[in-house]
Amino acid sequence: VFQHTNIKPDIGIRVDYKAACPANLTVSDIDLCALIGNLIDNAVEACEGLADPYIRLYIGVLKNQLYISVTNATKDTVRKLDSEYITTKRGNHGHGLKRINLVVEKYEGYINRQNEPGVFVTEIMLPL
């Protein structure tokens, strides 16, 4: 997954991760890669220009579901519209956020996003 994202060693983002993915998943490999790839791409963009950028990724099984958590440093408070986080990109396209939401909906999963000063967290649970 990391080789298909914007994480480059020269930009200085500290990345901590732990991943233990079960062999049998209901989510397709394509959807899982799109989901994790977009989560990481968004985290990398949020870290741009920060003095101490970091990303933490955890993938495992929790309560008999696939649990994915991405925590990253951020300088911005992410905007919301009707309780949904929206993109901060020019043009407000937010294709990554839409793709993440579509994959979670497709598999009848759960997504939780939290934004506090200096940190953004996305947690996703998908049925196994």
Describe every region a protein language model picked out.
Residues 50, 54-64:
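Short beta-strand/loop element within the Bergerat-fold HATPase_c
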Residues 16-35:
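Conserved short strand/loop->alpha-helix "switch" segment adjacent to the catalytic nucleotide/phosphoryl-transfer site
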Residues 29-51:
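Conserved ATP-binding N-box helix of the HATPase_c
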Residues 108-118:
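Glycine-rich ATP-binding loops of the HATPase_c
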Residues 64-94:
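Glycine-rich/acidic phosphate-handling loop/turn and adjacent ATP-lid/helix
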Residues 1-11:
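Short beta-to-alpha transition helix within the HATPase_c
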Residues 76, 116-123:
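Glycine-rich nucleotide-binding loop
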